[in-house]
Amino acid sequence: MDLARRAAGGDRRAFAALYDRHLDAVYRYAFYRLHTDAEAEDVTGEVFHRALVAMPKYEPRRPFLAFLYGIARHVVADHLREQRPSASFEDAIAHASDAPGPEETAARLDDARRLRAAIARLTPIQQDIVIFRFLEERSTKEVAQLTGKPESTIRGIQMRALAALRAALGSEGER
Amino acid sequence: MSDMNDRDLARFAEELARFDRPSAPPALRAQLRASLLAAPVVVVSPPRRAPFALFTLPSLRLALAAVLILAVIAMAGGSAAASSLPGDPAFALTRAGDEIQALVAFDDATRLMTRVAQSDRRLADLETALAHRPSALAPATAEYIAATERVSAELATVLAQPRTAARDAAIARAAAASADHIAALQALAARLPADAQFGIQRAIEVQQTVHGKTETLPGRPASPAPSAAPGRPSNGPGRGSAPTALPGRP
């Protein structure tokens, strides 16, 4: 029996194995969709706790990551609704983390945070498509399943999203 | 959009894929994992009976009385009990609620699931006590051991019954929880002061007994329970001692 089926049957070790496998993907989604690292951590925790509660209702034919992303999209949307108005992205970049790491790690994280600030300038659906399609490198078909939109729509939006992101990154670079 | 633009965008998309990917911080990874493993289990309700079938149950009156008592307890001190830790006066309400939950369980397999869920909560209490209130550590350990012994007793009852899907699922749930608990207890033991080691080692031993019982499920592959805390002798203090000898235990 696969891990997801066992987890749906209440096997906590199976759920822990799924958690280990998918934590980073969920965290990255939250990281890019939200304003600060702390918010991303809170939302990641909320996603997995909700997933644990929803496991008995999990449909095993559906990919488990799609199940997690579905929850993550809802939790992020709820979070953004509750948090508005929030700190500016300039604040988010300046105070993204209280824990400075080694220089190289910090530089890589700065890149990721600059990208996050640029992604925030896109519409919510453009953000999802950029994250799933280009940062997580999912196929157009998978992105269509994750977002519930036809593949042709995804292909149309992804080009506009890329153009908007490139422009946003350009203006972020001028700051 | 022109071909030129499309090519530029395709190149830009390739650049995006080369961005370093942030990953979950190690502290989040560890804390969230522990909190998920300690979270109370959602027990799926058994299938609903037809309304008239309820009246044929011999324990109906007892169950209704218990539900009423539970409601009174919930109204009287539900929130206090929910946030209480072992050793608090309000914790008596939590224990009473646990007993009623077990009393009104439809069958032994459901009762075993209930007892396992209760032991999950006692483990969470233990972790909360260690993190926020060390004075509650001894009673929390004693309550955890008592909850595990109730799981062990219920497990013995269920193991003696003929195989059914519900029975096997309950035993599998108990086995999974037991393995997780042993791992969690060993992690806790590493953080506990020397004077709290007695209780936690006893808790590990009781939980290993539970795990050993689950290995008797036919068709279950033999998987040894995690051993006693690393670096500690297996015949350390507490082996074979009665749990009543624990500090903080009534």
Name what the model sees in each region:
Chain A
Residues 2-6, 114-122:
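Short amphipathic alpha-helical boundary/capping segments
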Residues 6-17, 27-46, 146, 151, ...:
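Short, charged helix-capping/linker segments at alpha-helix termini
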